[in-house]
């Protein structure tokens, strides 16, 4: 990618970023006391549409963030190393369906639970990522802002998915418990190269999982509208 292309992308990103920050419809659905309500004013179908919209935006911004980090901090020979065993994704151990046959066999509710597990597994690592990126001498504000935006929207997405599961199951109360698995391990003071590769792995893996969230939610939408023609 030549320097002019990079600059052009930077200009467009700067122009569109304020719009992206305000374009998404908020998922927050709270009572005055701050607890999640059953959202009686919005249908399950519309809530799912909002959840999908959030997932689409999160994936898009995660893709932009990963590409920006890669261009700025990761030499080309090191870009393949994130696939090695030492840089495995933190969600690898989660019971998330991966093959097409597995996905086709699970229920709608388990699709949503899979999304919830992925969302909650990334909340803490993204907070950590904000802290570590802030220590880079030449990290652009655009990258820091995107990471903060995704972190905030992920919490909003979590709230929307929890409410959606409650609506589908008609449950009065549902709380999140997957975060207790402790999937993310901190290294006190990694050297600079190790820190770059770890952050690159986090961004790359999150982009991949954000895409899974979007795919699962869109599959759920398809099942509800055209059950027998969803791949």
Swiss-Prot record:
Its main location: secreted. Glycans are attached at residue 145. It comes from the Eukaryota. It is found in: Secreted. Pituitary gland. It holds the Pfam family Hormone_1. One of its GO terms (molecular function) is growth hormone activity. Disulfide bonds join 29-39, 89-205, 222-230. Keywords: Disulfide bond, Glycoprotein, Hormone, Secreted, Signal. Residues 1-24 form the signal peptide. GO terms for biological process: animal organ development; growth hormone receptor signaling pathway; positive regulation of growth; positive regulation of receptor signaling pathway via JAK-STAT; response to nutrient levels. GO terms for cellular component: extracellular space. The keyword Coiled coil does not apply. Belongs to the somatotropin/prolactin family. This is Somatolactin. It comes from Paralichthys olivaceus (Bastard halibut). The lineage of its organism: Eukaryota, Metazoa, Chordata, Craniata, Vertebrata.
């Amino acid at each position: 990618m030549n320097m002019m292309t990079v600059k052009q992308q930077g200009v467009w990103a700067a122009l569109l970023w304020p719009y992206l920050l305000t374009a998404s419809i908020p998922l927050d659905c709270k009572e005055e006391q701050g607890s999640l309500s059953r959202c009686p004013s919005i249908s399950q179908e519309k809530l799912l549409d909002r959840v999908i919209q959030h997932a689409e935006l999160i994936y898009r911004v995660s893709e932009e963030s990963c590409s920006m980090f890669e261009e700025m901090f990761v030499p080309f020979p090191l870009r393949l190393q994130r696939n090695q065993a030492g840089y495995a994704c933190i969600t690898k151990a989660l019971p998330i369906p991966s093959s097409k046959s597995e996905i086709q066999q699970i229920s709608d509710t388990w699709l949503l639970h899979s999304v919830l597990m992925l969302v909650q597994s990334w909340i803490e690592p993204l907070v950590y990522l904000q802290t570590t990126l802030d220590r880079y001498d030449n990290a652009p504000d655009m990258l820091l802002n995107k990471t903060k935006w995704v972190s905030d929207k992920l919490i909003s997405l979590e709230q929307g998915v929890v409410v959606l599961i409650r609506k589908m199951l008609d449950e009065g109360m549902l709380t999140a418990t997957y975060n207790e698995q402790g999937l993310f391990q901190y290294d006190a003071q990694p050297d600079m190269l190790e820190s770059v590769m770890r952050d690159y792995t986090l961004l790359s893996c999150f982009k991949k999982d954000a895409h899974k969230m979007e795919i699962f939610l869109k599959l759920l939408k398809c099942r509800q509208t055209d059950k027998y023609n969803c791949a």
